[in-house]
Amino acid sequence: MIRELTVTGSYFDVGYQIGSFGRKIIKQLLQKNRKIFETVLNKKRLQIEKTQKFIQKKAPYLLEELRGIAMGAKVNYNFIFLRNFPEITNSSGGCTTVLIKNKKDFFVAHNEDEDDSLINENFALIQFNLKNGLRYNSFVLIGELPNNAFSWNMAGIFCCVDTIVPFNCDNLSYLPRYFESALLIEQASLKNAIQFLKKNRNCSGFHYLLADTLNKKAVSIEKSGKTTSVKKINNFFYHTNHHIHNKFSKKYTNKENFGTSKARLAICASLLNKNDYQEQVIKTLTTKFKRPFIKNDSRKTFATVICDINKKNIKIFNDDEDVILKKC
């Protein structure tokens, strides 16, 4: 079952409320990764401080949100920061995104996959009501910044995220990808979101599927450092965890090694087609033995989200049974 939470106030306030809400889980997860975090802090402290200074200039309020989470959960702030700096801890995730546009349907579907050792209580659907007037909803792994999975805001922008193999982590002095994605969901239009991603340089890479539910448009955006590729989607599209845009794939495809990503992309292609209706996609993505995965895959689908662009609603499926319905 997916837990729901509403947080209100300043960035520090919402962080504190999230930290208090998920205190037990945050402590368990940090304890699990304590040795990794301590090693990184000892060996890469100067780089961490340099990155924090860059974030302090670019988006200081996000650091305040992390301080709030740390205080609410009563844990070490540095550990919370490292949890939101996956480039320096060399951590990553894996998900699947599908978009189908045909005579009947226009929708985005996204599987949120995480390691099977995690439990559902680690996640929550959080409604953010910030003091500055921003409003958005985000499916959050407790202790992380919003919009690393899927989110939608008051401007009608829906966003889902797929980790991409990073190619240029030599310079970690820019925005970590979690910070970039948190800033992205605050954008007031699809145009602003695209411009933001083009101007910003992050430490690694992400794939963003952005849907404008008001104007019925969708784009796929791949990022790697300072390079951005934008692709307008008009019919059928799917993505896992490696670059597939021509701007990147011709250069990097043969060098990539990202676990099950290519296999899952092929499975996704074999399971779905452009004429599928929403019911078929839901059945494919939410059924344990049909979702895009390969044998011995340790990842589990914790939630599947469907953003119906025509009807402007969000359906979130969990454990084949629970369904949460929201407007976007």
What is the meaning of each model-derived region?
Residues 1-75, 85-86, 102-107, 111-328:
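C-terminal, well-structured catalytic/ligand-binding subdomain of enzymes
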Residues 78-98:
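Short, glycine/charge-rich beta-strand/loop segments that flank catalytic centers
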